[in-house]
C-alpha cells in the first residue's frame, strides 16, 4: 500500500514548480480542451464539478502525451446574483465574498491534480476582464448590434427594483413577499436575431450531441408563413400577426395576445378593464412558460375590451389575452381560427366565441353546430369569397398574394428566437458603458475611459437599482459636449461574461485588446468542450452569436467556437441528484482525504461512460482504492524479460486503451487496464511493459503514475512522456488463443473436480498433436491452479497414453479431453 497523501502532495508541488502544463504558441499541432468554467458559489466543489474536471483532465493529459500543444485553462464565472444576495442578507462585500469563494474552489481543484495552465486564469468580476465586455459592447453598438427599447420586466413596487424570474416566488418578491407586477422599462438588447439563420444553418457542421442541436433548432424556431395586418377598430394602428395557415384567414374570429405584449398595457390604459387585465397579467407572467403552452394545461384568457378588423372580411373580432400565447412565438399575437385549430376550438367553446368553418374535407360537409373538434387537415376552402373551392396548398399562396397586393400582408420567415435582453438592475455585473446627456442623447463611453468600474460606495438594501445610489458613479460629464450627464445604472447579463471567456484564455494578459487575432486564430476553435446539458441553449447559443459577431467585426477568423461538445451526466445517490436538501451529498474533499484524488478520479471515470448519469457507490470507491494499491505492487515483481504472451497482450491493450480514451470510453479503458494488471501479476513482465502500463493509467491516476514512473528510474514526468504505441506485429493471435484454451481447460478441471468430489486428483489431459507443446509448457501452472497431485498431457494419437476411460477421442482443437482419478 502506498501513502497517497504524500504522493499526491509531492507530485502536485513538482508539477507547479516545473510548470509543465504552461502553454504558448509553438510548432506543435494545437489542441484546445475546455470545461465550462464554474460559478464560485459558497458551497465550493461538488461531485458534478469533480466529474466534469476529471473527464476534461483525463482527455487533456491523453492528448498532451500524444504530442499536442494543449491549451487547458481554468477561470471563474464570477459575477452573479448570489454574491449580491449575500451582500443584502449578511452585509458582506460581494467582491470579498466572491474572491474568498474563488480561493476555496481553486484550492479544491488543485487537490484533484488537474493539469491546468493556471497562468491563463480569468475571473470575470475583475476590471481587467469586464473592461473588455464594455469594449465589445461599444463595438456592437457601433455596428447596430446593441440597441435600446422598451421591454416588460418583473417589478417590485415595495423594493423599487426589477426582479429576475428566479426572484419571483409564487407571484411575490423573494425578499419582501409583496406582489410583483409587470412593468415596461427601457432596456438594452443585443441583436442576436441578425444571426438566426446562420446559427441554425451551422448546427449541421458541429460534432455535438444530436439532442443539443435539436434543442437549439427548436429554440431558434424557424417557420415560413405569412405576416398579416389586423387593424384596430377606430384606429390607424394595427397588429402584425404571423400565421402558417393564411388559408384559414376567413375563419379567424378573434385575436389572442401574449399577456407580456408591450401593447396590452397601452390598449387598456384608462379603460374600465385596466385593473382586471393587470391582475390577470400578473397572475399569468409568473407561470412557467413551457407549462403555459403544455397540451394538458388549462387554457384561460380575458377579453381586454378592444376589437380588431379581419383584413379580408372587415368583420369586427374581439381581442383576448391568454396564458397559452407567448411573446416568444411570431409577433406575440395570434389569429384564432377555432374551426381549424384544436386549442382555439377549446378556447372558443369555453368563452362562447364564434366558430366559422372555412375548410372541409373533399366531398364532405362540416357544420359548426355538429363540430366536436377542430378540423385540422387539408381540404377545400368554403366561406372564403373568391378563394372557395381552392385546395389548402394553393389557397395559402393565393391569399398571401392577395394580401400583398392590398398591402395587408406578405410572405415571411419568422424565428422564435428573440433579441437578447442584457440589462440587469443589479450591482454585481459589468456596468453598461453608456452616458445619457439631455443635450446629446445616448453617448457611448470613450474607449480610452474604459473600464467603467463598479463604485464601492454602495449600501446593499435590496431596494432600487444599486448603482443609482452612487452619486460619484452616476454624475459624469458628457463625452461629446462636456456638460453634466448621467451614467447608465444597469449592468450586463452575466451570460455576456461567458460568451467570450474562451477567447480571453488565448491571450489573458493583453491590455490593449480583448485578445489578439494571432493568438485566437492559432488556438481556436475549442477542439473539445465539456459541460452540462443545462447550458445547451442559452450559454452555447450566446457564445456562438458572439463568435460570429466578432468575426464580422474582423476581430477573429472563425465561424464557430466549439468543434466537439460532450455533455456529462448527473451524479446520483439513492436514485436522486445530489443536493443538500435531500441529504444525499457526497463531499469530494472528504473522499480525497480518505482515499486520495486518484481513487476519486478513477472511480468517477470507471463507473459509467461520461454522458451517462451514474449512481454513487461507497463499495465502488473502495474497490478502486484496492485496485490502485494492487497496481502499485506491480513494482515488486518486475522481471528481466517478458513472456511472449505478455508482449502480445500488452500491444493489444495499448491499441484498445488508446481507442477507448479517444472515444471517451474511459470506463472500458480502465476495465482493460484492470484485467491486464490482474493477469500480468502471475507472468513474467519486464520494466518496459510496466512502464507502458503506467503511462496508460496516467490520465486517470496521474499522481500514482508519476510515483511509479520515478520508482522505475525515470527522471522525466510521466505526464509529458510519449504515449505508448502499439506494435501490431507483436500481437500473436495464435499464442493468445492457445493461452485462452489453457485457461478454459483449468476452468473445466475445476468444474469436474466439484462434480466428482476429488480434492487433489491426478489429472490427464488429451490434446490434438499440435497443441501438445503449449500444454506441456503450462503443466506446472495447471497443476498449481487446480491443486492436482500430478498433471500428464498426451497427444490423442500417443499409443502409450494412460486412458482407462477412453476419453482421448473426445479431444477437439482448443478443447482437450480431461480425465481425473
Predicted region positions:
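N-terminal catalytic cores of NTP/NDP-binding nucleotidyl/phosphoryl-transfer enzymes
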Residues: 24-92, 121-136, 243-244, 311-347, ...
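Basic, alpha-helical terminal appendages of large translation-related enzymes
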Residues: 1-30, 258, 270-275, 353-365, ...
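Catalytic alpha/beta core of large soluble enzyme barrels
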Residues: 56, 69, 264-361, 367, ...
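Residue patterns forming the tRNA-binding/recognition surfaces of aminoacyl-tRNA synthetases
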Residues: 10, 14-18, 88-242, 246, ...
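Conserved oxyanion/phosphate-binding beta-strand-loop segments in alpha/beta enzyme cores
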Residues: 1-34, 64-73, 97-104, 208, ...
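Acidic, turn-prone loop/beta-hairpin segments
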Residues: 77, 434-438, 444-445, 451-452, ...
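Long, charged, mostly alpha-helical binding arms that flank functional sites
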Residues: 2, 222-227, 360-363, 369-401, ...
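Amphipathic alpha-helical
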Residues: 12, 192-222, 258, 262-302, ...
Amino acid at each position: 500500500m502506498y501513502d497517497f497523501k504524500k504522493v499526491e502532495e509531492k507530485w502536485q508541488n513538482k508539477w507547479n514548480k516545473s510548470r509543465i502544463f504552461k502553454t504558448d504558441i509553438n510548432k506543435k499541432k494545437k489542441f484546445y480542451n475546455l470545461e465550462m468554467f464554474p460559478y464560485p458559489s459558497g458551497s465550493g466543489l461538488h461531485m458534478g464539478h469533480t466529474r466534469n474536471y476529471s473527464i476534461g483532465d483525463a482527455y487533456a493529459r491523453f492528448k498532451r502525451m500524444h504530442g499536442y500543444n494543449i491549451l487547458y485553462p481554468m477561470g471563474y464565472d464570477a459575477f452573479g446574483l448570489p454574491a449580491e444576495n449575500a451582500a443584502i442578507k449578511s452585509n458582506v462585500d460581494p467582491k470579498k465574498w466572491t474572491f474568498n469563494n474563488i480561493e476555496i474552489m481553486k484550492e479544491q481543484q488543485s487537490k484533484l491534480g488537474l493539469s491546468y495552465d493556471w497562468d491563463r486564469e480569468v475571473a470575470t468580476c475583475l476590471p481587467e476582464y469586464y473592461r473588455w465586455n464594455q469594449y465589445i459592447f461599444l463595438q456592437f453598438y457601433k455596428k447596430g448590434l446593441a440597441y435600446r427599447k422598451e421591454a416588460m420586466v418583473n417589478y417590485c413596487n415595495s423594493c423599487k427594483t426589477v426582479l429576475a424570474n428566479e426572484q419571483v416566488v409564487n407571484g411575490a418578491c423573494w425578499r419582501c413577499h409583496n406582489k410583483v407586477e409587470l412593468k415596461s422599462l427601457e432596456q438594452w438588447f443585443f441583436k442576436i436575431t441578425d444571426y438566426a439563420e446562420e446559427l441554425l444553418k451551422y448546427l449541421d457542421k458541429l460534432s455535438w450531441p444530436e439532442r443539443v442541436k435539436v434543442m437549439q433548432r427548436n429554440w431558434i424556431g424557424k417557420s415560413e408563413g405569412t405576416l398579416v395586418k389586423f387593424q384596430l377598430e377606430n384606429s390607424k394602428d394595427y397588429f402584425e400577426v404571423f400565421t402558417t395557415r393564411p388559408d384559414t384567414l376567413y375563419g379567424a374570429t378573434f385575436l389572442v395576445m401574449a399577456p407580456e405584449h408591450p401593447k396590452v398595457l397601452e390598449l387598456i390604459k384608462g379603460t374600465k378593464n385596466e385593473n382586471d387585465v393587470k391582475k390577470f397579467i400578473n397572475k399569468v407572467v409568473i407561470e412557467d412558460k413551457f407549462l403555459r403552452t403544455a397540451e394538458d394545461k388549462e387554457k384561460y384568457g380575458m377579453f381586454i375590451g378592444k376589437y380588431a378588423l379581419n383584413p379580408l372580411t372587415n368583420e369586427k373580432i374581439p381581442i383576448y389575452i391568454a396564458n397559452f400565447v407567448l411573446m416568444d412565438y411570431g409577433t406575440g399575437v395570434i389569429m384564432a381560427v377555432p374551426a381549424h385549430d384544436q386549442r382555439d376550438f377549446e378556447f372558443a367553446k369555453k368563452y362562447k366565441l364564434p366558430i366559422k368553418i372555412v375548410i372541409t374535407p373533399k366531398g364532405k360537409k362540416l357544420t359548426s353546430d355538429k363540430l366536436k373538434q377542430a378540423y385540422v387537415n387539408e381540404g377545400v376552402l368554403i366561406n372564403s369569397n373568391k378563394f372557395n373551392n381552392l385546395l389548402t396548398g394553393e389557397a395559402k399562396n393565393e391569399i398571401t398574394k392577395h394580401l400583398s397586393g392590398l398591402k395587408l400582408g406578405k410572405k415571411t420567415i419568422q424565428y422564435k428566437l428573440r433579441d437578447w435582453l442584457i440589462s440587469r438592475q443589479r450591482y454585481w455585473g459589468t456596468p453598461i458603458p453608456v452616458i445619457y446627456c439631455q443635450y446629446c442623447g445616448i453617448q457611448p463611453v470613450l474607449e480610452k475611459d474604459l473600464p467603467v468600474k463598479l463604485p464601492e460606495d454602495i449600501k446593499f438594501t435590496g431596494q432600487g437599482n444599486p448603482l443609482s445610489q452612487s452619486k460619484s458613479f452616476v454624475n459624469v460629464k458628457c463625452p461629446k459636449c462636456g456638460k453634466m450627464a448621467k451614467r447608465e445604472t444597469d449592468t450586463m447579463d452575466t451570460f455576456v461574461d461567458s460568451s467570450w471567456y474562451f477567447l480571453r484564455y488565448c491571450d489573458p494578459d493583453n491590455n490593449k485588446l480583448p485578445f489578439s487575432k494571432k493568438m485566437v486564430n492559432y488556438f481556436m476553435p475549442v477542439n473539445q468542450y465539456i459541460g452540462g446539458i443545462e447550458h445547451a441553449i442559452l450559454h452555447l447559443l450566446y457564445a456562438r452569436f458572439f463568435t460570429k459577431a466578432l468575426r464580422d467585426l474582423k476581430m477573429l477568423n472563425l465561424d464557430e467556437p466549439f468543434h466537439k461538445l460532450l455533455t456529462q451526466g448527473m451524479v446520483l445517490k439513492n436514485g436522486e441528484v445530489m443536493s443538500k436538501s435531500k441529504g444525499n451529498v457526497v463531499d469530494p474533499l472528504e473522499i480525497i482525504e480518505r482515499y486520495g484524488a486518484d481513487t476519486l478520479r478513477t472511480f468517477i471515470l470507471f463507473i459509467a461512460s461520461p454522458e451517462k448519469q451514474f449512481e454513487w457507490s461507497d463499495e465502488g470507491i473502495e474497490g478502486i482504492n484496492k485496485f490502485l494499491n494492487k497496481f502499485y505492487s506491480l513494482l515488486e515483481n518486475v522481471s528481466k524479460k517478458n513472456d511472449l504472451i505478455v508482449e502480445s497482450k500488452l500491444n493489444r491493450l495499448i491499441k484498445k486503451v488508446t481507442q477507448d480514451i479517444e472515444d471517451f470510453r474511459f470506463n472500458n479503458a480502465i476495465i482493460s487496464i484492470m484485467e491486464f494488471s490482474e493477469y500480468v501479476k502471475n507472468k513474467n513482465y519486464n520494466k518496459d511493459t510496466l512502464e507502458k502500463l503506467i503511462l496508460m493509467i496516467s490520465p486517470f491516476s496521474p499522481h500514482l503514475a508519476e510515483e511509479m514512473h520515478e520508482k522505475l528510474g525515470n527522471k522525466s514526468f510521466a505526464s509529458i512522456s510519449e504515449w505508448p504505441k502499439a506494435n501490431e506485429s507483436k500481437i500473436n493471435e495464435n499464442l493468445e488463443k492457445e493461452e485462452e484454451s489453457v485457461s478454459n481447460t483449468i476452468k473445466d478441471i475445476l468444474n469436474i473436480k466439484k462434480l466428482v468430489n476429488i480434492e487433489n486428483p491426478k489429472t490427464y489431459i488429451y490434446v490434438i498433436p499440435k497443441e501438445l507443446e503449449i500444454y506441456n509448457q503450462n503443466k506446472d501452472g495447471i497443476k498449481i491452479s487446480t491443486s492436482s497431485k500430478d498433471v500428464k498431457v498426451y497427444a490423442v494419437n500417443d499409443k502409450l497414453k494412460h486412458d482407462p476411460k477412453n476419453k482421448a477421442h473426445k479431444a477437439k482443437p482448443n478443447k482437450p479431453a480431461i480425465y481425473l482419478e
